[in-house]
Amino acid sequence: MEAKLFVLFCTFTVLKADTICVGYHANNSTDTVDTVLEKNVTVTHSVNLLEDSHNGKLCSLNGIAPLQLGKCNVAGWLLGNPECDLLLTANSWSYIIETSNSENGTCYPGEFIDYEELREQLSSISSFEKFEIFPKASSWPNHETTKGVTAACSYSGASSFYRNLLWITKKGTSYPKLSKSYTNNKGKEVLVLWGVHHPPSVSEQQSLYQNADAYVSVGSSKYNRRFAPEIAARPEVRGQAGRMNYYWTLLDQGDTITFEATGNLIAPWYAFALNKGSDSGIITSDAPVHNCDTRCQTPHGALNSSLPFQNVHPITIGECPKYVKSTKLRMATGLRNVPSIQSRGLFGAIAGFIEGGWTGMIDGWYGYHHQNEQGSGYAADQKSTQNAIDGITSKVNSVIEKMNTQFTAVGKEFNNLERRIENLNKKVDDGFLDVWTYNAELLVLLENERTLDFHDSNVRNLYEKVKSQLRNNAKEIGNGCFEFYHKCDDECMESVKNGTYDYPKYSEESKLNREEIDGVKLESMGVYQILAIYSTVASSLVLLVSWGAISFWMCSNGSLQCRICI
């Protein structure tokens, strides 16, 4: 009986065996990512692929200042509206800024033909050389060049006219046929602008040009048009019943443009030799211009980001991330972040068999925790960690490189008569945007799934590496841990970690301890059976005695009557 009690005592005594556990890193990160199967998975490390912030400023682009048109628009700037005199010397820019109240355009009412196409052309121009194409003093000796002014284009309270055009009228009582040519020798394309005046009455036609049946002809190798004044009564706009239509063309190097007219010509005074080849553009923004520099500008503000995607604004100028509709694009680089719960022990589930990470292991993603007579501690597995870091870093860089197509995306220009085309274009652009957004989100979801599976696989591989070394010299006790059947000092623990564990060296000790433990288990089973019988009999006796005592008490006070019949 004494021997059995000793064995029973052993079964309730915790024997502190040496152990080694495989685990993974955890930290206090709150980063969450989405995968194909899950949303908001907390991870230890991640990288953001989506820029969602800006500085609220309009900045220089790569050191080149933008051109702020203020209250003027492109038409007013190029024609030379007197209200835009501050822009007369502007000849270079990184991009052009119009504001929501850029209303000073054509001061004399009329239509600017193909104006949207001209604005589109400016997207590839960042500077020009402004020059006199037909000098005012010498080009028109037989015509008047000083009386062509109007209250619609007033300056300082007096009638004036566009700074880059000349309103040619009759001299005395005649308007002789004029013919003037210019040959482009600038070595680049030249932008030429002119106009045609349409008076409201025949009397005004004769008053200005003398000739009732006047015409204007403009021709080059690529452009050839003949205009006749459309004389008609019209409602007044800016005090004018007449109209002026404005035209433009690009003159190639070596090409010649000829103007011929017998009246109604608004002649070019200045032209522009264009420097093409760089990405520019026109944006509409009320943001302030600051002394700052950026590589990417949006109407809302500048982006200083190397990320492949942004959701700030679809219109961008410079080297900009691709616009997507997404609100979150975060790529996992680390592991699932599930710190172990202390009441559960060190582990809590990655890879399906380990239920929590270690915040105490800070020098690697995967590693070990050991405990023996010399103490306990964490140690990262540097090789598997470094291989994982290299692989994931390469993958992230590859994704960013493939998706990080930096470019300018300016809005397309449409006039009021092209609304159906504009609406169709918006639908097409929205379709492309939806595809881009879907592709970006799907890419991130798939890569996050692969990354987390990759980490799970690495932890499993590390576990299998330990298991294959220890074999039956230790037993699996769950949660990624092994309990040794032999004493394993720090040197022994280190050999397990670095893959040099000497199985034969410890196999004999392990065999003896394993057999002893198995014997204790068998004896314990016999003791448990005896205890079970004793417990059953004792319980029955207690119940029987209790029932008898209660019955005797009830008979003695008359609560229970007992009759014995023979």
Curated annotation (Swiss-Prot):
The chain crosses the membrane at residues 530-550. Glycans are attached at residues 27-28, 40, 104, 304, 498. Palmitoylated. In natural infection, inactive HA is matured into HA1 and HA2 outside the cell by one or more trypsin-like, arginine-specific endoprotease secreted by the bronchial epithelial cells. One identified protease that may be involved in this process is secreted in lungs by club cells. It is found in: Virion membrane; Host apical cell membrane. One of its GO terms (molecular function) is host cell surface receptor binding. Major glycoprotein, comprises over 80% of the envelope proteins present in virus particle. The extent of infection into host organism is determined by HA. Influenza viruses bud from the apical surface of polarized epithelial cells (e.g. bronchial epithelial cells) into lumen of lungs and are therefore usually pneumotropic. The reason is that HA is cleaved by tryptase clara which is restricted to lungs. However, HAs of H5 and H7 pantropic avian viruses subtypes can be cleaved by furin and subtilisin-type enzymes, allowing the virus to grow in other organs than lungs. It comes from Influenza A virus (strain A/Duck/Alberta/35/1976 H1N1). It is a single-pass type I membrane protein. The keyword Membrane applies. The gene is HA. This is Hemagglutinin.
